[in-house]
């Protein structure tokens, strides 16, 4: 390649070569990330004739550099002269698609898929398809796995003779000796099926699907379950029973729990793909078995799908199927030995209320909710409480309130701070559903207790919780019930609690407005400017800066300004700094 002697146009390429050969990975990475700038400077012709061959030859670098290169090349079409020259990008990407590191290969495949759309049909056949064939017939499994992701993007736009060849290559990959290749083929089978003609789906994809679904490796079989969804969507209803269902039944009872888990995980999609009749005859019994599976992971995956499955049952049989076939299984899952299973069920079970309506909810679901509210696992109780809105719409929450209260109190005092945090986040929702009287009587004291929790994240969440409660119940309520308690904390011996008063005033002032802030909260803030602890004093300055915009100008001048000016003379540097900042921001300086 030409040297950079006195020729400015060559300068960027010289820098690039120097940096690409530099010992320092970071420099090599930076130069790769600037590749588009360099290509622009070189122009399309030299990018094609010099830069790309150079890059193709240097593919033996750190994975991070190769990953950046694979990504860059996917956006290079205009830099090589547009679609008619896009095939020049194939050699470096082909090399990248064969490297050992999976992340690099995947990125190269992603870029190849992107630029495939910019090839004309004749260029696809002349350049892209030969690349796919080379990768698919490569000696290393890495190139064969990469090939699997390239069939669906070129298949629709090539001649029928080439299509037949591509199908043959894909068939070979599905029966490759290496499990990693069969896995890659299984994971792309569904998307390949989508671009095939229906006759070929029936005659060629279905046999591949059946073979992969009975592969000796469970990691291959479980990917065939994913493909099943796509294939079932493509076939007419009358073919499903013969072509797909035997394989699906076999997967639902597979000896490997990972395959059964995949069936449970994809159940909603499978259900929609096969339609109401097959659901009634086949999927309902299969779902019952998955809910009773011996492996907890499978039961948990099925539990997650309970609500969606019931929602999607056809209206004529929905209630009957739920009451006679699904509910008995749910009742067993409520007292499952595994807490993940119970927790998964608790996150969706409330959603059955709107489906079953008021009477069935009260008779059948309510006892289950109450049992779950008393469960020893906090996640179960939390999941029930966080989904109360579904039930509230159907039966009103009063039915639950007697059991709710002990559950809420227990969670509010749970030893794990993350559990306490989660219940705080649901408090505004609960408050809105339970009403102000119930809240004041039973929950107000909890909300105040959180303000003095020993974990800062809880105190912080409790503060913003107060704001949301005032938004729900109004500022008069705040004035009567919350503000007096918050202000009382300003005399607490613990300086952290005194600071919490300031944090609460910051957020309450936003929702309570000028009148309440000026008359009731400001005097406390101003008084706290004389606190013995510097941390409290500088938070006074921050609070005044925060609530200043809410106050009227005369209050700012007569009450706030003197206090801030006094704080600028404080012996503590932080107090001085924040007081000065507040004066500046409020335009009082």
From Swiss-Prot:
SUPFAM superfamilies: ARM repeat. HEAT repeats lie at residues 8-46, 47-84, 85-123, 124-161, 162-200, 201-239, 240-278, 279-321, 322-360, 361-399, 400-438, 439-477, 478-516, 517-555, 556-589. The keyword Hydrolase does not apply. Transmembrane segments: none annotated. One of its GO terms (molecular function) is protein phosphatase regulator activity. The modification N-acetylalanine is found at residue 2. The keyword Nucleus applies. Residues 8-399 are annotated as: PP2A subunit B binding. PROSITE patterns: HEAT_REPEAT. Keywords: Acetylation, Cell membrane, Cell projection, Centromere, Chromosome, Chromosome partition, Cytoplasm, Membrane, Nucleus, Repeat. Residues 400-589 are annotated as: PP2A subunit C binding. It is found in: Cytoplasm; Nucleus; Chromosome; Chromosome, Centromere. Coiled coil: none annotated. Residues 85-239 are annotated as: SV40 small T antigen binding. Residues 47-321 are annotated as: Polyoma small and medium T antigens Binding. GO terms for biological process: meiotic sister chromatid cohesion, centromeric; negative regulation of hippo signaling; negative regulation of phosphatidylinositol 3-kinase/protein kinase B signal transduction; spindle assembly; T cell homeostasis. InterPro entries: ARM-like, ARM-type_fold, HEAT, HEAT_type_2, PP2A/SF3B1-like_HEAT, PP2A_Regulatory_Subunit_A. One of its GO terms (cellular component) is protein phosphatase type 2A complex. Disulfide bonds: none annotated. The modification N6-acetyllysine is found at residue 280. Its main location: cytoplasm. PP2A consists of a common heterodimeric core enzyme, composed of PPP2CA a 36 kDa catalytic subunit (subunit C) and PPP2R1A a 65 kDa constant regulatory subunit (PR65 or subunit A), that associates with a variety of regulatory subunits. Proteins that associate with the core dimer include three families of regulatory subunits B (the R2/B/PR55/B55, R3/B''/PR72/PR130/PR59 and R5/B'/B56 families), the 48 kDa variable regulatory subunit, viral proteins, and cell signaling molecules. Found in a complex with at least ARL2, PPP2CB, PPP2R1A, PPP2R2A, PPP2R5E and TBCD. The PR65 subunit of protein phosphatase 2A serves as a scaffolding molecule to coordinate the assembly of the catalytic subunit and a variable regulatory B subunit. Upon interaction with GNA12 promotes dephosphorylation of microtubule associated protein TAU/MAPT. Required for proper chromosome segregation and for centromeric localization of SGO1 in mitosis. Together with RACK1 adapter, mediates dephosphorylation of AKT1 at 'Ser-473', preventing AKT1 activation and AKT-mTOR signaling pathway. Dephosphorylation of AKT1 is essential for regulatory T-cells (Treg) homeostasis and stability. Each HEAT repeat appears to consist of two alpha helices joined by a hydrophilic region, the intrarepeat loop. The repeat units may be arranged laterally to form a rod-like structure. Belongs to the phosphatase 2A regulatory subunit A family. This is Serine/threonine-protein phosphatase 2A 65 kDa regulatory subunit A alpha isoform. It comes from Bos taurus.
């Amino acid at each position: 390649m030409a040297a950079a002697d006195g020729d400015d146009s060559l300068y960027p390429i010289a820098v690039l070569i120097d940096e690409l050969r530099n010992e320092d990975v970071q420099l090599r990475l930076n130069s790769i990330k600037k590749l588009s700038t360099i290509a622009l400077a070189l122009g399309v012709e030299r990018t094609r004739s010099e830069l790309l061959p150079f890059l193709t030859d240097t593919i033996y670098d750190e994975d991070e550099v190769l990953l950046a290169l694979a990504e860059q090349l996917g956006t290079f079409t205009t830099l090589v002269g547009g679609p008619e020259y896009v095939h020049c990008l194939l050699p470096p990407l082909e090399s990248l698609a064969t490297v050992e590191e999976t992340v690099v290969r995947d990125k190269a495949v992603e870029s190849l898929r992107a630029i495939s759309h910019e090839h004309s049909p004749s260029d696809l056949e002349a350049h892209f398809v030969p690349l796919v064939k080379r990768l698919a017939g490569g000696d290393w499994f890495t190139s064969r796995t990469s090939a699997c992701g390239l069939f669906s993007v070129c298949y629709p736009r090539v001649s029928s003779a080439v299509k037949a060849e591509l199908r043959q290559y894909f068939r070979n990959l599905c029966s490759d000796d290496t499990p990693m290749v069969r896995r890659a083929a299984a994971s792309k089978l569904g998307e390949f099926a989508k671009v095939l003609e229906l006759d070929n789906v029936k005659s060629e994809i279905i046999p591949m699907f059946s073979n992969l679904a009975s592969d000796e490796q469970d990691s291959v079989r479980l990917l065939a379950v994913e493909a099943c969804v796509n294939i079932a969507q493509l076939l007419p209803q009358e073919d499903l029973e013969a072509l797909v269902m035997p394989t699906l039944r076999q997967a639902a009872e597979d000896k490997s729990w990972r395959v059964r888990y995949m069936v449970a995980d994809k159940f909603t999609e499978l259900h929609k793909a096969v339609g109401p009749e097959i659901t009634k005859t086949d999927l309902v019994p299969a779902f019952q078995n998955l809910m009773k599976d011996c492996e907890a992971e499978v039961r948990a995956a099925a539990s997650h799908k309970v609500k969606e499955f019931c929602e999607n049952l056809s209206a004529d049989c929905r209630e009957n199927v739920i009451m006679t076939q699904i509910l008995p299984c749910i009742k067993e899952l409520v007292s499952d030995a595994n807490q993940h299973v119970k927790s998964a069920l608790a996150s969706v079970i409330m959603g059955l209320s709107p489906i079953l309506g008021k009477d069935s909810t009260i008779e059948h679901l309510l006892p289950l909710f109450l049992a779950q509210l008393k469960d020893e696992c906090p996640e179960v109780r939390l999941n029930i409480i966080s989904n109360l809105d579904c039930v509230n719409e159907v039966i009103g929450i009063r039915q639950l309130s007697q059991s709710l209260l002990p559950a809420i109190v227990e969670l509010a005092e749970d030893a794990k701070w993350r559990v306490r945090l989660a219940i705080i986040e649901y408090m505004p929702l609960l408050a809105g559903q339970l009403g102000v009287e119930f809240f004041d009587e039973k929950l107000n004291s909890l909300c105040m207790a959180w303000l003095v929790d020993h974990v800062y994240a809880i105190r912080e969440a409790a503060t913003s919780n107060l704001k949301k409660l005032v938004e729900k119940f109004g500022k008069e309520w705040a004035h009567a019930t919350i503000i007096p308690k918050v202000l009382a904390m300003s005399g607490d011996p613990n300086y952290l609690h005194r600071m919490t008063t300031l944090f609460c005033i910051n957020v309450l002032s936003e929702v309570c407005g000028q009148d309440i802030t000026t008359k009731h909260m400001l005097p406390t803030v101003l008084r706290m400017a004389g606190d013995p602890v510097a941390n409290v004093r500088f938070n006074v300055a921050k609070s005044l800066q925060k609530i200043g915009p809410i106050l009227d100008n005369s209050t700012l001048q007569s009450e706030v300004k003197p206090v801030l000016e006094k704080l600028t003379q404080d012996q503590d540097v932080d107090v001085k700094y924040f007081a000065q900042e507040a004066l500046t921001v409020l335009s009082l300086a």
